[in-house]
C-alpha cells in the first residue's frame, strides 16, 4: 500500500514540514507516504470561490489516476476515530493499494471531486489551519498503523 496526501495551499512554515517529515519517516519502512503540494487558485477580494474551487479541481484531477482510491477530508462527513482509521487502513491494504487523501483549499473541495471520491471522512468539527492538517493526518496514519501492528504508541 502507498498513501499520497494531496494538499492545496501555500508553502507551509518550516515547523509544519518538520512535523510531517517525522511521521513520514516513522511510516517509511512499512507504508510509503508522499506529500504532493498543489497551488491554490489566485484569490481576489471580488472573486468567486466557486470558480476558484473549479480551478483547483482541474489541478487535483491531473494528480489522480483511475486506480487511485480517493479519500477526501470533508468537515460535513462522519468524524472517524483512530481505531476506525486503522480499520480503513487494513481494508486499503488489501483492496486499494493506491490511496490518495485530499486536503482541500481554503474554500473547500469542488463538488466534481466530491463526486468521484471513494470515501469522505472528517477529522473534527473544529477548523484547523490547512498546513497543520498535514501533520495531524500523518500522525493519525502512523498511530493507526501502530494499532494494527500491536505497537504501544497508541496507549
Swiss-Prot record:
The organism of origin for this protein: Francisella philomiragia subsp. philomiragia (strain ATCC 25017 / CCUG 19701 / FSC 153 / O#319-036)
NCBIfam families associated with the record: PRK00103.1-4, tRNA_RlmH_YbeA
Protein name: Ribosomal RNA large subunit methyltransferase H
Keyword Zinc-finger: no
Molecular functions per Gene Ontology: rRNA (pseudouridine-N3-)-methyltransferase activity
Function of the molecule: Specifically methylates the pseudouridine at position 1915 (m3Psi1915) in 23S rRNA.
Pfam families, per the entry: SPOUT_MTase
Top-tier EC class: transferase
Subunit structure and binding partners: Homodimer.
Location(s), subcellular: Cytoplasm
Family: Belongs to the RNA methyltransferase RlmH family.
Highest taxon listed in the record's lineage: Bacteria
EC number assigned by the record: 2.1.1.177
Stored InterPro entries: Alpha/beta_knot_MTases, RlmH-like, tRNA_m1G_MTases_N
List of residues binding S-adenosyl-L-methionine: 73, 104, 123-128
Catalytic activity line of the entry: pseudouridine(1915) in 23S rRNA + S-adenosyl-L-methionine = N(3)-methylpseudouridine(1915) in 23S rRNA + S-adenosyl-L-homocysteine + H(+)
Keyword terms: Cytoplasm, Methyltransferase, rRNA processing, S-adenosyl-L-methionine, Transferase
GO cellular component: cytoplasm
CDD domains found in the cross-reference section: RlmH-like
Gene: rlmH
Keyword Transferase: yes
